[in-house]
């Protein structure tokens, strides 16, 4: 977009912009730069708003940018909200005295949010205005918030001094509808016509969204500081490390003994060196096998005890039979009887 060089006088800048618009025609994009300076409310009231007669064709295109610059780098920008009617845009009536100054304000230079707010009767073409609109009832239009204008497309004024405050205003149609805001006003002249461009921080305008509350911290945060250790803490730390080392050594020694006791693990350990997990796994298998063998041995032992008792009973019966046989032999000898078995045996 073509932009005129900034002048020290606001009226001269506006006149130059109007002259350029007549030279380029209604189809060319226009840019207007205004400069106002002031440090307090008194300077704001004394600053006059000079708006020259600009033809309606000059504002036919909505790609119009308004840029505010400070007279000194990093200073405050004093700006005002003005209302321009169709008659003033068409060149009808008084061009300077009929301008209605809504309010003035000042802010420090830096990145600010730009908010565009439409009011009822905003079918008019945008006029050169910027600042906060006083509260009162009016129908809202979509707004567009632009952070740090001219940051991603390059400033129209290439020779601008770095560090100065710059604020641009775009129509809502070129930026896109992002949200809506309610603007209240009590002045009937504000609802008569014209479109207002409001420049302020987003917190002052975007109050329709729900605010998320953050719970306060219940206890204070106390970061750990490693540099405040006492000799006692160092001694306790050393003792703890020594105890832990001894415990690990004992565990390793017992695992080595297990590897020596288990037959298969001892053979594997001598070759490749089994790990602790492998040693413990084979130890569990060996213990399980020993338990099964012990159970079988218990059953066998019970059977042996039962057989032993049976043998004892049989032995007793044999002794009784031997005694009975000896008595019978003695009786036969008393009666001089020979046993048939013995005679034939002889």
Swiss-Prot record:
Keyword Nucleus: yes
Chief location category: nucleus
InterPro entries with a match to the protein in the record: bHLH_dom, HLH_DNA-bd_sf, USF
UniProt cross-references to CDD domains, sorted A to Z: bHLHzip_USF2
Highest taxon above the source species: Eukaryota
Any GO CC annotation of this UniProt entry: nucleoplasm
Biased composition range(s): Low complexity: 11-20
Tissue expression per record: Ubiquitous.
Oligomeric form and interacting partners: Interacts with MAF. Efficient DNA binding requires dimerization with another bHLH protein. Binds DNA as a homodimer or a heterodimer (USF1/USF2). In vivo, the USF1/USF2A heterodimer represents over 66% of the usf binding activity whereas the USF1 and USF2A homodimers represent less than 10%. The USF1/USF2B heterodimer accounted for almost 15% in some cell.
Summary of the function given for this chain in its UniProt record: Transcription factor that binds to a symmetrical DNA sequence (E-boxes) (5'-CACGTG-3') that is found in a variety of viral and cellular promoters.
Protein name: Upstream stimulatory factor 2
Taxonomy of the source species: Eukaryota, Metazoa, Chordata, Craniata, Vertebrata
Underlying gene: USF2
């Amino acid at each position: 977009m073509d932009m005129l060089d900034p002048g020290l006088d606001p009226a001269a800048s506006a006149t130059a912009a109007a002259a350029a618009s007549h030279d380029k025609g209604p189809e060319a994009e226009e840019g207007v730069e205004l400069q106002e300076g002031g440090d307090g409310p008194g300077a704001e009231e004394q600053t006059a708003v000079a708006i020259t007669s600009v033809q309606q064709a000059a504002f036919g295109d909505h790609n119009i940018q308004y840029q505010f610059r400070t007279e000194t780098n990093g200073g405050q920008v004093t700006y005002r909200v003005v209302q321009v009617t169709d008659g003033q845009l068409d060149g009808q009536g008084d061009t300077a005295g009929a301008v209605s100054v809504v309010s003035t304000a000042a802010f420090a230079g830096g990145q600010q949010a730009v908010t565009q707010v439409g009011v009822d009767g905003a079918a008019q073409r945008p006029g050169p205005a910027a600042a906060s609109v006083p509260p009162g009832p009016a129908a809202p239009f979509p707004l567009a918030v632009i952070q740090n204008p001219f940051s991603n497309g390059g400033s129209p004024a290439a020779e601008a001094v770095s560090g100065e405050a710059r604020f641009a205003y775009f129509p809502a149609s070129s930026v896109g509808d992002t949200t809506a805001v309610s603007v209240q006003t009590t002045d009937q002249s504000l609802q008569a016509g014209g479109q207002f461009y409001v420049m302020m921080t987003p917190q002052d305008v975007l109050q329709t969204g729900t605010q998320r509350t953050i719970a306060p911290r219940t206890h204070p945060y106390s970061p750990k500081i490693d540099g405040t250790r006492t000799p006692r803490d160092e001694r306790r730390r050393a003792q703890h490390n020594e105890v832990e080392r001894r415990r690990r050594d004992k565990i390793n020694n017992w695992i080595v003994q297990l590897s020596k006791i288990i037959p298969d693990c001892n053979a594997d350990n001598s070759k490749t060196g089994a790990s602790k997990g492998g040693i413990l796994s084979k130890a569990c298998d060996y213990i399980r096998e020993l338990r099964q063998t012990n159970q079988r041995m218990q059953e066998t032992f019970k059977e042996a005890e039962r057989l032993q008792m049976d043998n004892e009973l049989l032995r007793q019966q044999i002794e009784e039979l031997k005694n009975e046989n000896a008595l019978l032999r003695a009786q036969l000898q008393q009666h001089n009887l020979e046993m048939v078995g013995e005679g034939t045996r002889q």
